[in-house]
Structure formats: structure tokens, C-alpha cells
Amino acid sequence: MNLIELQHALRQLRLGGIATVLETRLHQAQTEAMAPIDLISCLVADELTRRGDRLLERRRKHAAFRDPQKTLDHFDFNFNPKMNRSLVFDLATCSFIGKREDALFLGPGGTGKSHLAQAIGQAAIQQGYRVFYREAHVLLDELAEAVVDGTRKEFMETLTTVPLLIIDDFGMRKLPLTAAEDLLEIVMRRYERASTLLTSNRPVEDWGKLLGDVAAVTAMLDRILHHGHVLKCGPRSWRTKTAATTAAGTV
């Protein structure tokens, strides 16, 4: 079996990581007089690295972050110095996911809630957790569509079982009439079973009016806050700062 045939056989065995680097590693083995066990170790490590990278890629794609580039490395904590940094970094360790706890990020628009939520989602993926991200109005629209096409049970199963569900921008857009009922069902089914991270620009006192069902909102908040971490963002807005800077530059 020559090199090309061997690479083809490796791919048939789903060992594409080894097939891709085989020629390079064989050349290295000859150049460095590597022992057979060292060569095999390198090839196995290459395959494991490739599989790990592809798994992370699939999980990021499944999470469907709105802004995949948002990470903690790109967040300026000095812009809002009163933000609880310790809580942010504690959440980024993802220990709250292992404990099946929840998180609630509150504050005006443009204060970094979505950035931090997605950054924590990225950290969770790096640590081996599955994540599902949706803006609140998109999530509820998809749930309504699932009712129409008969896939609500399957979609709800996804929402119930994913280790971290991020519901972003709650209260930013108009919500369907079934929003209170649907959100309460999601929260109840996930309570003490999986972690939910919710962001909102509306104070919790307004949620009853927003959803038109005070009882449902009370039940939902009771569960989120029972084992929940609350992060208050703001008051300064990045978008306001950017707009002011742009306007100043055009004067």
C-alpha cells in the first residue's frame, strides 16, 4: 500500500486527521529518527486535535450566536467600572452550569449584556458544554412555527435539555400573545435541570405588564432567581458613546 492508498484508507476509517498530516509526520520521523511509538503518538494526537476542533466548530454553529466574535477578551470593563467583574468571571468558569443554576443580566441597551452572554456561551463551549442562543422574539417565533409544522415537541426537547440556554434581549421587541405561557413552560422544564441565561433591558417590575400575565411572570422569576445570579449592567451605553464619537468626528 503506497502513501496515497494509505491516506485513502485512513479517511475511510474516519481518521482524516492522521491522513492529512501523515506525509509530514513520516518526513519528520525520518529527519529526526523518531521511534515508532513517538510517531504513533504524534499521529494520534493530531487526530484527537482535529476531532476536538471539529466538535467545537459544530457546537458553535449549533449555538448560533448573533455575534460569534464576542469574548471576554474583547470586553472593556473600565467603561462601566461598577459592574461586578467577579461575578462575570465566576460565570465564565461555567461552574454555574454544572450546578444547574441560572443567570439574569439586566440593564439599559448598549451596556454589554449581549456581549457578556455570548462570551459566557463561548466559554461554555470551550469547556465542553452544548449551548443554544436565541434572541427572545426569535425563540418565541420559532416555537410558534414549530406548532404549525408539528415539530413543537422536538423543538421543546432541544430547549429543555441543552446545558445552557441563552435567551437574549427579552423585552426589546414585541412578543406574541403566547409569550408568557411559552416562556414559563421553558423555565419550568429547565428548572434545576439545566442552566438558563436571560438578558433584558427592562426591569423585572415591568415584566408582568410586558407579558400581560403577572402570575406567569412571578412563577418564572421565582424559578430563575431561586438559584440565580443577577448581573446589573450599565448605566453607560457603548452605542451612545460610539454615536457621540462619530458625530464629533464629523464636526
Predicted region positions:
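Intrinsically disordered, low-complexity and often Lys/Arg-enriched segments
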Residues: 1-8, 246-251
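Solvent-exposed alpha-helical segments within well-ordered globular domains of core cellular machineries
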Residues: 4, 8-11, 20-23, 41-42, ...
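Interdomain "pre-motor" coupling segment immediately N-terminal to P-loop NTPase/helicase cores
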Residues: 7, 17-68
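Dynamic helix-loop-helix/coil hinge segments at AAA+ ATPase domain boundaries and subdomain interfaces
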Residues: 9-12, 61-84
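Active-site catalytic microenvironments for nucleophilic, acid-base chemistry
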Residues: 46, 123, 127, 189
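Conserved P-loop
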Residues: 83-161
